[in-house]
C-alpha cells in the first residue's frame, strides 16, 4: 500500500492542464479582477464607471494595501432611485460569497429615530437587553473568514438618525463596533462596507424634468456631468466632513438612457423565461413586447423601479393564463410566443 506522501507526489506531478481547459470556478482564496468586472458588468448594465470603481477598491484591499485597522473598503454608492445601487452590492456578494443574499443588510430607514439607536449598538448597561448584546448585525456574516470577506450594506444611509451616524463613524474609521454594554465588539476589518444614498435625487429629478421640457427647444446639456455635480454638492451639504472623509470610494451611478433601459428590460425578461424553462415552458418574447415593457416599465425620473412590477402584470400574467389553458395538467414541454398587440402582450402557442 503506497504511503500518503507518495500519493501526494504522484498527484502533484500530474500534468497541469492548459489555461483554456481549466475549469471554473476560481479556487478558494483566489481573486481575478477581470473576472469580477466581467461578472458585474453582465448583470449591472449601463454603469461601467461604477463597476470599475468598485472592482478597483476591492483590488486594492485584496493585495493588502489598505489600513488593517479599518474595513477592507468603505464604498458609498450614490444616485437616483432605480439605477442599481443595491443590486450592485448583491452582485458583489454573489461573486465574493455564496450568493446575492449572503450579506448583512441594514435598512437605515428602520433607524430614523433616536430611540432605535439601541438596536444598532445594543442596549447600554442598566437597560433591558444589555446582557444579551443584541444588535442588528450577524456577527458571522460581518466578520467573515480569511478566505471569504464579509459584505455589509447600510441601505439609504441618509435616513438614519444622527446618533446612528455618529456610531457608524467608529465602524468606518476603527473597523469595529463596540457594543453599548462595553464588553463586546464586532469587527468589520475583514468586511467590505457599502453605503447607499439617494442624496441629490430630487435635484437630479428636477433637472431631468427640465431637460425633457427643453428637448422641444433642442437645448443640449451634459447630463451625466451636471447630474454628478448636483449629487456631489448634496453629499457635501448633508454629511459632516469627518464622516465624508472616512469614505474610501464615492461612486455616483448614472441615470439610464434608452439603450441601457432596453438592456435592463431584456435581463429582467430573461429571469422570468429562465424560471419557466426549468418547468419545461419555453417563452419567446419578440422585440415588440420588449419595447412595450420598456416603455411602460421605465420612468424618466424614477428609473427601473417599476420594471419588475410591469413585467409581472403585463407579461407574466398572460403567460400564466396561456399555460393554464394549454397545459392544465402534466409536465409535457410547452412553447409559447409573446408579442405586443396594442398596449397589451398577447401570448399564444408557438407553431
From Swiss-Prot:
Which residues are noted in the entry as ATP-binding?
A: 79-86
Chain positions covered by the region annotation Disordered: 1-26
User: What are the GO MF terms of this UniProt record?
Assistant: ATP binding; ATP hydrolysis activity
Q: Which SUPFAM superfamilies match?
A: P-loop containing nucleoside triphosphate hydrolases
Q: Which GO terms describe its biological process?
A: cellular response to heat
Q: Which UniProt keywords apply?
A: ATP-binding, Chaperone, Nucleotide-binding
Q: Which GO terms describe its cellular component?
A: cytoplasm
Supply the Pfam families for this chain. AAA_2, ClpB_D2-small
Instruction: Extract the InterPro entries matched here.
Output: AAA+_ATPase, ATPase_AAA_core, Clp_ATPase_C, ClpA/B, ClpA_ClpB, P-loop_NTPase
Family classification: Belongs to the ClpA/ClpB family.
For this protein, the record's PANTHER family field holds: ATP-DEPENDENT CLP PROTEASE (PTHR11638), HEAT SHOCK PROTEIN 104 (PTHR11638:SF18)
Instruction: Identify this protein by name.
Output: ATP-dependent protease ATP-binding subunit-like protein
Amino acid at each position: 500500500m503506497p504511503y500518503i506522501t507518495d500519493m501526494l507526489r504522484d498527484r502533484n506531478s500530474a500534468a497541469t492542464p492548459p489555461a483554456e481547459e481549466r475549469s471554473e470556478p476560481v479556487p478558494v482564496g483566489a481573486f481575478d479582477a477581470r473576472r469580477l468586472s466581467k461578472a458585474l458588468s453582465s448583470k449591472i448594465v449601463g454603469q461601467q464607471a461604477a463597476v470599475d470603481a468598485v472592482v478597483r477598491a476591492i483590488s486594492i484591499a485584496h493585495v493588502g494595501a489598505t489600513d488593517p485597522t479599518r474595513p477592507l473598503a468603505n464604498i458609498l454608492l450614490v444616485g437616483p432611485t432605480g439605477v442599481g445601487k443595491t443590486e450592485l452590492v448583491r452582485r458583489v456578494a454573489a461573486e465574493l460569497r455564496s450568493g446575492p443574499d449572503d450579506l448583512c443588510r441594514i435598512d437605515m430607514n428602520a433607524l430614523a429615530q433616536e430611540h432605535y439607536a439601541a438596536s444598532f449598538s445594543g442596549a447600554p448597561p442598566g437597560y433591558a437587553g444589555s446582557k444579551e448584546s443584541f444588535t442588528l448585525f450577524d456577527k458571522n456574516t460581518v466578520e467573515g473568514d480569511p478566505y471569504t470577506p464579509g459584505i455589509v450594506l447600510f441601505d439609504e444611509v441618509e435616513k438614519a438618525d444622527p446618533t446612528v451616524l455618529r456610531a457608524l463613524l467608529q465602524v468606518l474609521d476603527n473597523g469595529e463596533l463596540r457594543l453599548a454594554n462595553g464588553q463586546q465588539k464586532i469587527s468589520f476589518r475583514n468586511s467590505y462596507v457599502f453605503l447607499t444614498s439617494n442624496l441629490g435625487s430630487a435635484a437630479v429629478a428636477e433637472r431631468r424634468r427640465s431637460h425633457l421640457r427643453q428637448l422641444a427647444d433642442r437645448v443640449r446639456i451634459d447630463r451625466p456631468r451636471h447630474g454628478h455635480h448636483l449629487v456631489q454638492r448634496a453629499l457635501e451639504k448633508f454629511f459632516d466632513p469627518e464622516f465624508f472623509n472616512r469614505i474610501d470610494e464615492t461612486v455616483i451611478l448614472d441615470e439610464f438612457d434608452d439603450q441601457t433601459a432596453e438592456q435592463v428590460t431584456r435581463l429582467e425578461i430573461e429571469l422570468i423565461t429562465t424560471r419557466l424553462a426549468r418547468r419545461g415552458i419555453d417563452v419567446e418574447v419578440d422585440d415588440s413586447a420588449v419595447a412595450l415593457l420598456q416603455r411602460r416599465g421605465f420612468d424618466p425620473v424614477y428609473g427601473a423601479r417599476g420594471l419588475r412590477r410591469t413585467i409581472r402584470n403585463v407579461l407574466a400574467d398572460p403567460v400564466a393564463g396561456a399555460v393554464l389553458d394549454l397545459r392544465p395538467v402534466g409536465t409535457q414541454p410547452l412553447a409559447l410566443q409573446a408579442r405586443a398587440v396594442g398596449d397589451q402582450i398577447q401570448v399564444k402557442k408557438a407553431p
